[in-house]
Amino acid sequence: MSQTLLVVHVQVQVKPEGIEAFRAATLENARASVGEPGVARFDVVQAADDPTRFVLVEVYRDAGSPAAHKQTAHYQKWRESVEELMAAPRTSTRFVNVFPDDRGW
């Protein structure tokens, strides 16, 4: 079977004083994101050794779904609310799914 899922890791460094506000805004966005038809999974993880570092693991059903995600009201709200909380610009890396098979998501 052809693999079509797109996995995006978004790396975020937050100001220490913004950790709780970032977590709250990001969890609200994640909960809404998993309801999008193009989103297979949306995980939020925080570094065990540095609470200011987060990774958002976003799994999209196809290459067009990230653009659709960025048009949603909840994403727009998230982006605006966390902008001042960032210690540095966020970065991202795109991956193609290898395992499990797309049907396993």
What are these regions (language model features)?
Residues 1-6, 44-52, 80-105:
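Glycine-rich beta-strand-turn "strand-cap" elements at beta-sheet edges
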Residues 6-36, 40, 44:
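N-terminal first-folded block
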Residues 6-13, 43-70:
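Short, well-ordered beta-strand segments in beta-rich or mixed alpha/beta enzyme
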Residues 14-16, 62, 96-98:
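Non-catalytic surface loops within mature trypsin-like serine protease
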Residues 17, 28, 51, 73, ...:
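Short alpha-helical
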Residues 27-40, 59-93:
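An amphipathic, aromatic/His-enriched active-site/gating alpha helix that lines ligand/cofactor pockets
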